[in-house]
């Protein structure tokens, strides 16, 4: 995998200025978290405002954790999202009912868990691999054992979990993901991005 072609998603956006910085840096997607228990949660009202000036070819990803069907539909109706990202224990049937491209996040401890998710969520646009945690649904700042990722998965996968400017090149070289997802590794505090860290993260990948 050529690091220059790695796709990048920056997640947990809560401020317009952080989204604009991500756009200026050339990221492929930004993530909005619609989960009240998250420190990076955004309301529908705020989401409408901060996505207002996102140009074409920068995807908006709605990140959800075990949501009600009606809430997902409301987001689809109100926000111009290109992708849904399910970060809980949602079934494949639940994820596909919205007729919207989706990403299924899992928190694997074994290679078997990863392969099982690829098989179960066969119609997902990608599988996202994040760090297992009993306390947090992403944004832990911790990596997981990349050695468990099977080679030659039949589906594109997104690597997440504890990525930052110091380890991202090693992660890409070792894991060869289709894309990477960064959140806490580019923050000054939860939901507030550090623009210098954002720039350094991009430079570490693309040069």
UniProtKB/Swiss-Prot annotation:
Molecular function, one GO term: phosphoribosylanthranilate isomerase activity
Domain of life: Bacteria
InterPro entries referenced in this protein's UniProt entry, alphabetically: Aldolase_TIM (IPR013785), PRAI_dom (IPR001240), RibuloseP-bd_barrel (IPR011060), TrpF_fam (IPR044643)
Its EC number(s): 5.3.1.24
Keyword Metal-binding applies: no
GO biological process, alphabetically ordered: L-tryptophan biosynthetic process
Catalytic activity: N-(5-phospho-beta-D-ribosyl)anthranilate = 1-(2-carboxyphenylamino)-1-deoxy-D-ribulose 5-phosphate
Keywords, sorted A to Z: Amino-acid biosynthesis, Aromatic amino acid biosynthesis, Isomerase, Tryptophan biosynthesis
Pathway(s) where this gene product acts: Amino-acid biosynthesis; L-tryptophan biosynthesis; L-tryptophan from chorismate: step 3/5
PANTHER family per record: N-(5'-PHOSPHORIBOSYL)ANTHRANILATE ISOMERASE
HAMAP family: PRAI
Stated family: Belongs to the TrpF family.
Protein's name in the database: N-(5'-phosphoribosyl)anthranilate isomerase
Native organism: Legionella pneumophila (strain Corby)
The encoding gene: trpF
């Amino acid at each position: 995998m050529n690091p220059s072609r790695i796709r990048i998603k920056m997640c947990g956006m809560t401020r317009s200025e952080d989204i604009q910085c991500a756009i200026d840096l050339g990221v492929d997607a930004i993530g909005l978290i619609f989960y009240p228990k998250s420190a990076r949660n955004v309301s529908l009202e705020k989401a409408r405002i901060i996505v207002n000036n996102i140009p074409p070819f920068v995807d908006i990803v709605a990140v959800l954790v075990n949501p009600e069907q009606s809430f997902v539909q409301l987001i689809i109706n109100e926000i111009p999202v290109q992708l849904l990202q399910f970060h809980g224990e949602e079934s494949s049937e639940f994820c596909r009912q919205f007729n919207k491209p989706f990403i299924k996040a899992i928190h694997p401890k074994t290679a078997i868990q990863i392969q099982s998710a690829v098989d179960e969520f066969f119609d997902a646009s990608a599988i996202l691999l994040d760090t297992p945690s009993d306390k947090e649904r992403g944004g832990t700042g911790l990596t997981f054992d990349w050695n468990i990722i099977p080679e030659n998965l039949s589906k594109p996968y997104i690597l997440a979990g504890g990525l930052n400017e110091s380890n991202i090149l090693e992660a890409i070289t070792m894991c060869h993901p289709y894309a990477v997802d960064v959140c806490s590794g580019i923050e000054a505090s939860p939901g507030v991005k550090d623009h210098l860290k954002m720039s350094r993260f991009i430079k570490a990948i693309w040069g």
